[in-house]
């Protein structure tokens, strides 16, 4: 057996063998060895373990036994936490006078620095249920390290650096009027976006980069003062587009195209509030046809003109007697009469429906220049709904 380092227990074993030189060679030949090796780390040492003890014949053997047993127990207690060791077993058959029949050799490696630290950490474990006992030195050291790292991260220099970076990425919005430079951090989002304070956004004349300007609330930009009208906060160009969208042409009826429903032509007419012309009696000419309107009361008669979907233009004449009549030989109106019901005195709202006459061919023959009523085109009846305002005198 080759060993690099010889321990005290090995020296005692060799000393015992040398004390009996007569049986050294014979015993070494007769003793078969059986090794059980386990890998480990650290300093190697050999500790004998006696599996059986019959008698001790000499004092040197007795002293060796006590020394070996004490050292083996000490090494076993120290290396109880060590996971690996080398174990060699020596089984010998000696004479009846020998005191040992079976000897175990344990080759143990001493724990390294890492194993010592692990053993010290495991010493904190409680014997009951594996709970960790409180170690003031162990936990106090870890708490101090954690607190030191946290305090280092929260130093004023680090916080100031972060705030400085945030300040550089988010500039403070200020008013761009010359001489103002008002902080707009607490202002409305509209003023922060366009960089103008509320006071200067309503001023009739401000100075921006040395030029006279005025803030347009419609364009949200600064324009020259000449582009604004007096007492107007929006530029003239934007106001013209705004008014054009809101204004409607007057004197024109907005008519829906004719549609066929239940074999009848329906026409809707909306009156835009234009003052009505008062006429006593008028003569209307349309192509080869002449319309003669004779209302019963001519004091407050008026005329309505509108255009149908087929392109023909028709006129209706009504009077304050709440009766109106119209006739056409070729334009699509049947001869008939309709009453207008007034909801109240001088209210100015009228509604009426033009009904089909009982004898349409007879009505057309009376107004037509042709003597043959069958030569006239067929006209479909329709309903007319009117609503308008009358300007009182």
Curated annotation (Swiss-Prot):
Main location: nucleus
Zinc-finger ranges (SBP-type): 172-249
Cofactor comment: Binds 2 Zn(2+) ions per subunit.
Pfam families linked: SBP (PF03110)
Subcellular compartments: Nucleus
Keyword Transcription regulation: yes
Expression induction or repression: Negatively regulated by microRNAs miR156 and miR157.
Residues at which Zn(2+) 2 binds: 216, 219, 223, 235
Disulphide bridges: none
InterPro entries with a match to the protein in the record: SBP-like, SBP_dom, SBP_sf
Keywords: DNA-binding, Metal-binding, Nucleus, Transcription, Transcription regulation, Zinc, Zinc-finger
Domain notes: The SBP-type zinc finger is required for the binding to DNA.
Function in brief: Trans-acting factor that binds specifically to the consensus nucleotide sequence 5'-TNCGTACAA-3'.
Name under which the protein is recorded: Squamosa promoter-binding-like protein 11
Name of the coding gene: SPL11
